[in-house]
């Protein structure tokens, strides 16, 4: 039974209301510093921990709760007579409920003007110590680290005579250990990112020890293949607009491959301006059709035409609300997952009878993940995300013929798509749509040939098309393939030892070529 609670929080959201309800239930309130003042100013009966222990706060508040009367009251096992006898001998009441959240270390070090002393002073000592004590003794002590749990605890107390069940206490304890682990991980990340001069401004993006925190969203029936087990975890630092923030409106549980392909589709479609409706169709993590249009329907129709065969059973993403008209067109095809920032009520009604179709709603966001991660045997490759979008002013025309305004638009579109195609990538585009995509080949020439064949199979002409290559042409052979297919302009990074030969070949063939200076390998 909860008779006495200790409340000491940095995040004071809802703490007064929570304490008021505890007081109404007859719970004695202990508190520290600013929390105690807030509760007292709110008219609540509260005892300062310094008065409770008979020992004053000291060292500028560094020592407040590190006292046997606090930790003894938390750690004592109520089912062990010797523990309870020790409490009685030393006149230590039990503390049955602990509410603590920690100094805002991560928010502090996120500030540009943070100094090492600022960071050090925001490393909480007493808070984690109390939290770990309470979480260890969770059979007897309820511990709250997150204001979202106030209501749950109050409901159980009201329903059970001030008692909280073991299952709830266990869940709250595991939440505490996850929280303190993340907190210590953030401290380690920061301190090991500092250079020899310990300058906050000169710290490395890649700390000597890297701690990452994820929480499980779901376990899956299987992984990439049926013989593999799998689960999906969400990054606790997931940015706005990340796939992990999806809300599933309908459909079966997402599979491992669904999520992998959905991420590829969403990242690609997000790269287009929201003022330009765009549609991306993904199969096996590669775009098989990408287009922009006057509306969602036009964008979808154009994207689907690129490769209607591969689009079967694909993942489709839009960067604008999916309306009824576009939904009706999409519903005619077999689609695994459909993603959009929002779905109109009429669009949702279209899919109501197709419960196997998974509808994911994800708000568009401008945030960029801190890291791009790739697991290798015994290690982890960590890099910054490939977030660079080349602007037309950054392009360098290297041929005698310059692209026309229409060709430049097509080149920019093709370059945007090529970034999301597995290397080696060759993408034919024209009129705001992909015409042929060659992906994942060991030879750039083969990717060019496949892209040309794809367009031919789809009945799409490549005459006057634009081509993007995710990396440089090492020889002129790949260039000749795309020009023979009908391309009149090419965009590529440049940087080959034979750039001069490739540029000369472009001049020989009478096409325009622009260099980006940026490569978009994707493995």
UniProtKB/Swiss-Prot annotation:
Coiled coil: none
SUPFAM superfamilies, alphabetized: Cytidine deaminase-like, Methylglyoxal synthase-like
EC number: 2.1.2.3, 3.5.4.10
UniProt cross-references to PROSITE patterns, sorted A to Z: MGS
Domain comment (free text): The IMP cyclohydrolase activity resides in the N-terminal region.
Family in the record: Belongs to the PurH family.
Keyword list, A-Z: Hydrolase, Multifunctional enzyme, Purine biosynthesis, Transferase
UniProt protein name: Bifunctional purine biosynthesis protein PurH
Domain of life where this protein originates: Bacteria
UniProt keyword Membrane present: no
All residue ranges annotated as the MGS-like domain in the record: 1-145
Catalysed transformations (reactions): (6R)-10-formyltetrahydrofolate + 5-amino-1-(5-phospho-beta-D-ribosyl)imidazole-4-carboxamide = 5-formamido-1-(5-phospho-D-ribosyl)imidazole-4-carboxamide + (6S)-5,6,7,8-tetrahydrofolate; IMP + H2O = 5-formamido-1-(5-phospho-D-ribosyl)imidazole-4-carboxamide
Pathway assigned to this chain's UniProt record: Purine metabolism; IMP biosynthesis via de novo pathway; 5-formamido-1-(5-phospho-D-ribosyl)imidazole-4-carboxamide from 5-amino-1-(5-phospho-D-ribosyl)imidazole-4-carboxamide (10-formyl THF route): step 1/1; Purine metabolism; IMP biosynthesis via de novo pathway; IMP from 5-formamido-1-(5-phospho-D-ribosyl)imidazole-4-carboxamide: step 1/1
Keyword Transmembrane helix: no
Assigned GO CC terms: cytosol
Organism: Cupriavidus pinatubonensis (strain JMP 134 / LMG 1197)
GO MF annotations in UniProt: IMP cyclohydrolase activity; phosphoribosylaminoimidazolecarboxamide formyltransferase activity
């Amino acid at each position: 039974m909860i008779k006495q609670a200790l409340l000491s929080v940095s995040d004071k959201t809802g703490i007064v209301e929570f304490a008021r309800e505890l007081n109404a239930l007859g719970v004695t309130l202990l508190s520290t510093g600013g929390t105690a003042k807030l509760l007292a100013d709110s008219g609540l009966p509260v005892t300062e921990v310094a008065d409770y222990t008979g020992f004053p706060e000291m060292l500028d508040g560094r020592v407040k709760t590190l006292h046997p009367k606090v930790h003894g009251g938390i750690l004592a096992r109520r089912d062990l007579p010797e523990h309870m006898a020790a409490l009685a001998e030393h006149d230590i009441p039990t503390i049955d409920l602990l509410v603590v959240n920690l100094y805002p270390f991560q928010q502090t070090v996120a500030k540009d003007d943070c100094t090492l002393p600022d960071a050090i002073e925001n490393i909480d000592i007493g808070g984690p110590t109390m939290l770990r004590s309470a979480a260890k003794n969770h059979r007897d002590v309820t511990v709250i680290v997150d204001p979202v749990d106030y209501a749950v605890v109050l409901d159980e107390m009201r329903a059970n005579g001030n008692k909280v069940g073991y299952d709830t206490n266990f869940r709250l304890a595991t939440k505490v250990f996850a929280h303190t682990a993340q907190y210590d991980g953030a401290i380690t990340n920061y301190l090991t990112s500092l250079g020899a001069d310990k300058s906050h401004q000169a710290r490395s993006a890649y700390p000597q020890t890297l701690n990452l925190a994820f929480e499980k969203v779901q376990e899956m029936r299987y992984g990439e293949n049926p013989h593999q087990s799998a689960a999906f975890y969400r990054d606790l630092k997931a940015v706005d607009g990340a796939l992990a923030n999806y809300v599933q409106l309908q459909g079966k549980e997402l599979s491992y491959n669904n999520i992998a392909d959905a991420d590829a589709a969403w990242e690609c479609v997000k790269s287009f301006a929201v003022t330009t409706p765009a549609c991306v169709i993904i199969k096996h993590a590669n775009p098989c059709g990408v287009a922009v249009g006057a509306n969602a329907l036009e964008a979808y129709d154009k994207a689907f035409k690129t490769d209607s065969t591969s689009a079967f059973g694909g993942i489709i993403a839009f960067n604008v609300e999916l309306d009824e008209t576009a939904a009706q067109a999409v519903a005619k095809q077999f689609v695994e997952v459909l993603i959009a920032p929002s779905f109109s009520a009429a669009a949702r009604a279209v899919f109501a009878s197709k419960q196997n179709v998974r509808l994911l709603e994800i708000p568009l966001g401008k945030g960029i993940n801190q890291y791009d991660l790739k697991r290798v045997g015994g290690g982890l490759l960590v890099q910054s995300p490939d977030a660079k979008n080349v602007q037309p002013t950054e392009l360098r025309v290297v041929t005698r013929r310059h692209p026309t305004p229409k060709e430049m638009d097509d080149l920019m579109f093709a370059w945007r798509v090529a970034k999301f195609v597995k290397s080696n990538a060759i993408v034919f585009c024209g009129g705001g749509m992909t015409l042929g995509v060659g992906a994942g080949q060991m030879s750039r020439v083969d990717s060019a040939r496949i892209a040309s064949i794809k367009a031919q199979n789809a009945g799409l002409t490549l005459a006057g098309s634009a081509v993007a290559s995710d990396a440089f042409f090492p020889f002129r052979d790949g260039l000749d393939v795309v020009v023979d297919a009908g391309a009149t302009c090419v965009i590529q990074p440049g940087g080959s030892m034979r750039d001069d030969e490739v540029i000369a070949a472009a001049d020989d063939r009478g096409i325009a070529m622009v260099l980006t200076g940026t490569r978009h390998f994707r493995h």
